[in-house]
Amino acid sequence: MLGTLYLCATPIGNLGDMTPRVVETLQTVDVIAAEDTRNSIKLLNHFDIHTPMTSYHEYNKVEKAHQLVGQLLNGQNIALITDAGTPAISDPGEVLVRMCQEQNVPVTSLPGPAACITALTLSGLSTRRFCFEGFLPADKKEKKAILEDLKTESRTMILYEAPHHLIRTLEELYAALGERRITLCRELTKKFETVFPTTLEKALDYYKTEEPRGEYVLVVEGKSPEEKRQEEIASWESMSIEEHMAYYEEQGMDNKSAMKQVAKDRGVGKREIYQYLHGNS
């Protein structure tokens, strides 16, 4: 009989957020796979949990995932926990989940705290559509590519950042996105929880005199529809109307449809485009 992998969300700060279901599961599984056993032992001791632990982290994720899947195939039940929050969100848990799926090992999630969602709900920014970026990569080329993608992102963006990198990241976001609203959250659910709604420019000014402390969740406003529309219009206006027509005709549009789309792009009537083209023909 196959074992089950339990993804157990743990508190991101306030121990009162630990659910009874997670406590019971951690007490009854055969093994707990933890991102940092030294950190997790404090949590387990607090809840009188004495289940054996093993480490599962970024630097052993592939080798250890194979080992854990082997134990699951032999019928052991395993709980996966991260240092704080929900496993597989910005941590190596996804590798283990994927391997379990490949071997048809049951996986279930015990939902609970997640810093990204907690910050989003506190941000005051749009929650209708959002994207999670986690930590920006250290590699400069990779980071540049992601920031380039985010320039046109219309959804609310959620990022994580360490205090010693915060100012640099704010500078990079400001350079890429321009002035945007941002909410900076730190110490979430703890005694000194801070939620700071501001703008990128004002945040940079603020942290020139205030030292960043604690882990941050950054919630950044996406590009507004009006801003995107103005950029599109500027882009189309850099083309001649003939070039604009050719662009759509090369994509397979007939002349009438292309004319209609060109008029829409430029915010003018179709008749105006028609008269221009025939006046210049």
Where are the predicted features?
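Glycine-rich, flexible N-terminal cofactor/catalytic loop recognition
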Residues: 1-57
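A contiguous loop/helix-start segment that scaffolds small-molecule binding in enzyme catalytic cores
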Residues: 2, 156, 163-281
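Loop/turn-to-beta-strand initiation segments
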Residues: 3-5, 75-79, 155-156
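Short glycine-rich anion-binding loops that position phosphate/pyrophosphate groups of nucleotides
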Residues: 12-13, 83-87, 163-165, 223-225
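Short active-site oxyanion
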Residues: 26-32, 104-108, 156-157
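Conserved helicase motor
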Residues: 54-62, 136-139
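Glycine-centered tight-turn and secondary-structure capping sites
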Residues: 92-94, 255
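Class I SAM-dependent methyltransferase SAM-binding "motif I" and its flanking Rossmann-like core
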Residues: 95-153
